[in-house]
Amino acid sequence: MTNVNPMIIAKATSWLKSNIDEKSKAEIQSLLDSTDKSELIDSFYRDLEFGTGGLRGIMGVGSNRMNVYTVAMATQGLANYLLKCFPNERISVAITHDCRINNTLFADTTANVFTANGIKVKYFKEMRPTPMLSFAIRHFGCKSGVMVTASHNPKEYNGYKAYWEDGGQVVAPHDINIITEVQKITSVDDVNWDKNDSLIEYIEEDFDLIYLNEVKKLSLSPIAIMLQRNMPIVFSPIHGASGKMVPAALKVFGFENIHVVKEQAEPDGTFPTVIYPNPEEAEALTMALALGKEVNAELVLACDPDGDRYAACVPDENGNFELLNGNQTGSLITYYLLSKWREQGKLTGKEFMVNTIVTTELIDEICKSFGVTCYSVLTGFKNIAEVILAQEGKQTYIGGGEESYGYLVGDFVRDKDGVSACSI
C-alpha cells in the first residue's frame, strides 16, 4: 500500500465536504477507499496549474484534473481580475469550444460563472475554431474570451485558453495577474455559482459569414483561382471544429472541387480514427492521403481539433504525397504573400512579418529580399500577437507564424488561424 501525504488526504477530504455534486463525492470516496492510492495521489497532490496559457490537463475528479470545479475556479479568478481592470465598464467575454469530451459542460460552466459575477457572455451557439473566438472578441468589443480546448493532445485531456481584449492570448502583465487571482480561489465554495441567464447572448450562424467575408479579403489571386477552381483539394478536420469553416473558406476563395474525409468529418472527442489528432503526425493524415490518391488531389489539408493549426501535403513526381514541415509551409506562404503584395504595388516599406526564434531563418531572408521587416519573437503565438498590437498605426502586418504549423495572415484575428491559412 502506498503511503499518502496527509496533505493529499486533507485536500481530498475538503473537496468531499465542499459544495460539489454527489457523483464527484462518490468518486473521491472511492479513491480514498481504494488500496491503490496512485490515482488519489495524482488527482490531489497539487492544484491544476493555471499557467500563462490557461489550464490543460487530464479530465477527472480532483484538484489536479480538468473538471467543472477547476474550470469554475479558474473562471472566478479571471472574472475577479476583469472586474478589477474594468471597474466602471460593462464587461463582456466571448466563449466557444471545440469537439472534446465535456466541452459543452465546461463552456457552460464558464459562461455561468461569468454571468454570476455580472459579466455579459457572447456565447457561440455551436462549436467553432479558435480563430473565430479571437475574431469575435475583436468584433464584439469583448474584454476577454475563453476557448475550451486541449488542441492536439490525446482524448483524455481538455483545456481552457484565456484571451484578452485585442483577441490575442493573455500576455504580461495580465497573464501573471490573472494567475495571481486564480490562485486566490482555493475552494469550490469561493466560486459565485448564482448564474444569470439574461446576461448570455448567443452568437448565431450568421456570424460565420462576417468572419468568412474577412477571410475572402485575404485573396490575392482571384483570377488564378478562377482558372483552377476545379483543382481537387482534400480536407480533414480530424474530428474537430473546423469541418464546416475550412470548406466554406475555400469556397469563398473560389475553389469548388473540395473533398472532405467523411470518416473524420463529424466532431468526435474520442478521435476514433487516429492515435493523436495532430496534423504534424503523418499517421493522423492516413485517411486524408488515401482520399487524396483516390481523387488525384493537388493538395491535401488537415487541421487540428480546434482549427488553429494546419498541415499541407503535396504530390511529388511519382504521385506520392509529401507532408510539408512547418518551416517549408511558412516559407512558401511568406514568399507567396510578399510576391503578390509587390506585384500589386502594395509594398511601401512600412510592412512587417513576425516569426518565432525557432522558425527557419529562411523566412527572415525572404523578407529582407522584399524590403519587409521581419520581427523574431519568443516561442508562443501570443508573442506574435503582441508585436502586431504594438505596431498598430506604425506598420502594416502582412503575416507570420511558427514552425509548429501555426500561421496568421492579416490582422483581423490575433491567434493562429488554420481556416484562413488553408485558403491561402
What spans do the regions from the language model cover?
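Short acidic, glycine/serine/threonine-rich loops at helix termini
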Residues: 104-109, 134-138, 156-162, 183, ...
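Conserved phosphate/anionic-ligand binding catalytic regions in large, soluble enzymes, centered on
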Residues: 44-64, 150-153, 233, 237-249, ...
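Glycine-rich phosphate-binding loop
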Residues: 143-151, 155-157, 162, 288-319, ...
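Proline/glycine-rich low-complexity loops and linkers
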Residues: 125, 185-207, 316-399, 407-408
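An N-terminal, well-structured beta->alpha segment
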Residues: 3-110, 201-230, 241
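N-terminal small/polar loop signature for handling phosphorylated ligands or for N-terminal nucleophile
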Residues: 94-157, 256-312
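Gly/Ser/Thr-enriched, mixed-charge loops and adjacent short helices
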Residues: 15, 19, 39-43, 47-48, ...
